[in-house]
Amino acid sequence: PKCRKEFQQAQHLKACQQWLHKQAMQSGGGPSWTLDGEFDFEDDMEKQGPQQRPPLHQQYCNELQQEEPLCVCPTLRGASKAVKQQIQQQEQQQGKQQMVNRIYQTATHLPKVCNIPQVSVCPFQKTMPGPSY
């Protein structure tokens, strides 16, 4: 599968990785999950002046849109794994599992948030108990 080959560079889906990392580190507050599982990006967007480089949201959506639809989920899985490894190396033990859960939770919905055609939700195996899709 060429998708797996594609996720070798640390550069790959860089904005996605940044976003996943940012979400993982947030315990509450910020644009994480609202109750119905939709994102609340509005706050994020308003802080960005028009003169700044495109907000992270736009960057990672561009990255995903450049992937082949077939590769979107495998590549996101790769990105999630990379972020997970970063967190496991650097953060203190406490709360780590929760962060990892948040990475996968966030990644699962990125295609939908970015309106990727043909992909809405990536069926990652959840690390938490509950249905695995």
Swiss-Prot record:
Cited SMART domains: AAI
Record has Electron transport as a keyword: no
Molecular function in Gene Ontology: nutrient reservoir activity
Disulphide connectivity of cysteines: none
Tissue: Cotyledons and the axis.
Entry annotated with the keyword Disulfide bond: yes
Pfam families listed in its UniProt record: Tryp_alpha_amyl
Function: The small, basic, water-soluble napins are one of the two major kinds of storage proteins synthesized in the seed during its maturation.
Subunit structure: The mature protein consists of a small and a large chain linked by disulfide bonds.
Name used for this protein in its record: Napin-1
Lineage: Eukaryota, Viridiplantae, Streptophyta, Embryophyta, Tracheophyta
